């Protein structure tokens, strides 16, 4: 009324406008969060609601432009966001409630942290006055996840909210990418405050370096030119930096052969003549022998973890080592390097391309070719259908599909035998080795890449850790093809038990109870679970394949399901093994080729 009357007499007091404008600029923390997500370009959010985030969910309901994915478990949720981020190059965004909702993120956060995946995870928290009082669904999630996140913080004041969110996205995607956790007390999010969201941030003490020290790089290139047996080692950092094309160009200019880590698969096409194979625990004979024999190892974007080095003190014993990595902490942590270069992989490789020339590797390549011929990467011929039959079909029937694996024998076999021609085409939990990653990972990849075929490859053990995500795939109309290698065992552990534990198969037979009659005298079901019936109960398509002649037809049938997922269960001989294999405590040259 005051404003109306003042307007009539054209005498509106200034203080009234100032007070009203100030009020109009005040919004709740919940509204600011949604605004921030849009300004950061977020188009997909993976969330599971609860008491401490219900107001955020309500704000998300009111907006348009952000797709909300509702998984069936928070662990699966973060795996879906993880694979979405890996395959799109965007930041994956999660929202879960306090207490168990937050703690269910832990495995997924550790997975993303090991593999350098940019995530921003928002967790609900009880109101500030309840923190520390053992309130219902209260946990110190920032403290719990401190060692497995790149950064974590509880927002204690409403005025810090916008800046904190901006910092979270900046930290997650810059330097070595990684997961960031922001804990949001419910009362902070309800409080009114500024509607402004920062355009940029300047974080004291966090200045990620991407530029290349040219003195170090030129020193490295001189060593490369002088080497008689040079070798490139490409890790996941090459893929994260989207440097596969320029890396391939450098490889071709120098004619230096390449080995990759499992996470580096796709840094160069596996069909390229200068690609040797994966190195490490289940690397190819030629790749491991090349590392053991080279006189210069030029590593880009690797962590030199135990899966690729074998016995540390005998890794690449004849080589000088050059290491390019964006993470200072990764250099000389496990393996002493002669020339360290802290830089973004793509920037460093782009600079290399300006200077490199042919390194004269003809004799060295001939030696490597002899190793390839001596022990080609293959599997023993068996009368029953085996993994190689399935991989042959995938290579023939799918062009540039995204492959997402679980963890185990099938994972290593996939990395050995599936053709990978581009970066971010093979997705897996490489650092932490998380069972249950495969199906939700495939769902996240399919959401981010709706026009690309996505195939998950899992064992019958790992797939059951997040099998409930079939519901998510069905309701989101995702044509994910979920391949299950069913050998009725936890295969990788069984392989170790067979080779090193006297065939004492303890806790690995997934049908252990079926070895004896039930106490009620009835027979056990033939399949536990019956994956075909399970798929159908969710509304997915289920197919069981028992011989190699049925494989191609099964994949063609799956391709027809463009609006729902398909499970293809392959009945696999439990005696199938993954070779080569490095002996425990052995060097890369100590390979078991078969048993």
Predicted regions: what is each one?
Residues 148-151, 202-203, 369-384, 515-518:
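Short glycine/proline- and acidic residue-enriched helix-loop micro-motifs
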Residues 177-180, 358-371, 383:
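Flexible, glycine/charged-enriched surface loops at secondary-structure junctions
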Residues 30-34, 38-43, 56-60, 369-445:
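Active-site diphosphate/adenylate-binding microenvironment
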Residues 15-356, 393-396, 479-482, 500-507, ...:
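N-terminal alpha/beta PP-like core and its mobile active-site loop of ThDP/TPP-dependent enzymes
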Residues 130, 136-137, 332-334, 340-342, ...:
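Thiamine diphosphate
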Residues 53, 74-79, 410-412, 547-551:
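Short acidic loop-to-helix transition motifs that present clustered carboxylates
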């Amino acid at each position: 009324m005051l404003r109306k009357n003042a307007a009539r007499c054209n005498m509106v007091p200034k203080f009234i406008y100032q007070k009203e404008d100030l009020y109009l600029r005040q919004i709740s923390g919940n509204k600011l969060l949604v605004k921030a997500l849009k300004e950061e370009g977020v188009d997909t959010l993976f969330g599971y609601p609860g008491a401490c985030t219900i107001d955020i969910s309500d704000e998300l309901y009111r907006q348009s432009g952000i797709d909300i994915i509702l998984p069936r478990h928070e662990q699966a949720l973060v795996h879906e966001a993880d694979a979405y981020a890996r395959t799109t190059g965007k930041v994956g965004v999660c929202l879960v409630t306090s207490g168990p909702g937050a703690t269910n993120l832990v495995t997924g956060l550790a997975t993303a942290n090991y593999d350098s995946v940019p995530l921003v995870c928002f967790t609900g928290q009880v109101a500030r006055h309840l923190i520390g009082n053992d309130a219902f669904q209260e946990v110190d999630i920032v403290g719990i996840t401190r060692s497995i996140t790149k950064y974590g913080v509880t927002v204690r004041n409403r005025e810090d909210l916008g800046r904190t969110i901006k910092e979270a996205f900046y930290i997650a995607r810059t330097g070595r990418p990684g997961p960031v956790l922001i804990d949001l007390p419910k009362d902070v999010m309800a409080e009114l405050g500024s509607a402004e969201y920062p355009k940029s941030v300047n974080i004291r003490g966090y200045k990620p370096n991407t530029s290349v020290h040219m003195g170090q790089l030129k020193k490295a290139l001189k060593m490369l030119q002088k080497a008689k047996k040079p070798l490139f080692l490409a890790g996941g950092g090459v893929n994260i930096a989207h440097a596969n094309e320029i890396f391939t160009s450098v490889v071709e200019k120098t004619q230096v052969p390449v080995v990759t880590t499992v996470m580096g698969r796709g840094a160069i096409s596996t069909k390229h003549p200068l690609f040797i194979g994966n190195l490490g625990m289940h690397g190819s004979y030629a790749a491991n022998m090349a590392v053991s024999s080279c006189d210069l190892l030029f590593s880009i974007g690797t962590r030199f973890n135990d899966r690729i080095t074998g016995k540390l003190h005998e890794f690449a014993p004849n080589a000088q080592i050059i290491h390019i990595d964006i993470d200072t902490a990764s250099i000389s942590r496990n393996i002493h390097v002669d020339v360290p270069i802290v830089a973004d992989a793509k920037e460093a490789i782009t600079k290399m391309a300006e200077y490199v020339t042919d390194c004269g590797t003809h004799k060295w390549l001939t030696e490597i070719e002899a190793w390839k011929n001596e022990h080609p990467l293959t599997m023993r011929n068996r009368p029953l259908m085996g993994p190689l039959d399935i991989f042959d079909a995938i290579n023939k029937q799918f062009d540039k599909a995204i492959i997402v694996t679980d963890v185990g024998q099938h994972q290593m076999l996939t990395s050995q035998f599936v053709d990978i021609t581009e970066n971010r085409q093979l997705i897996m939990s490489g650092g932490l080795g998380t069972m249950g990653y495969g199906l939700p990972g495939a769902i996240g990849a399919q959401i981010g890449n709706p026009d690309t075929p996505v195939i998950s490859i899992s064992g019958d053990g790992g797939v059951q850790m997040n099998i409930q995500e079939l519901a998510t795939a069905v309701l989101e109309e995702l044509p994910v093809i979920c391949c299950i290698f069913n050998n009725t065992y936890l295969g990788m552990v069984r392989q170790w038990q067979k080779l090193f534990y006297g065939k004492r198969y303890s806790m690995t037979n997934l049908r252990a109870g079926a070895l004896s009659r039930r106490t009620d005298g009835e027979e056990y079901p033939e399949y536990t679970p019956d994956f075909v019936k399970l798929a159908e109960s969710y509304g997915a398509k289920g197919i069981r394949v028992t011989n190699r002649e049925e494989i191609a037809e099964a994949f063609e049938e799956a391709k027809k399901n463009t609006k729902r997922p398909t499970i293809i269960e392959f009945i696999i001989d439990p005696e199938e093994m993954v070779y080569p294999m490095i002996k425990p405590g052995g060097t890369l040259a100590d390979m078991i080729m078969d048993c």
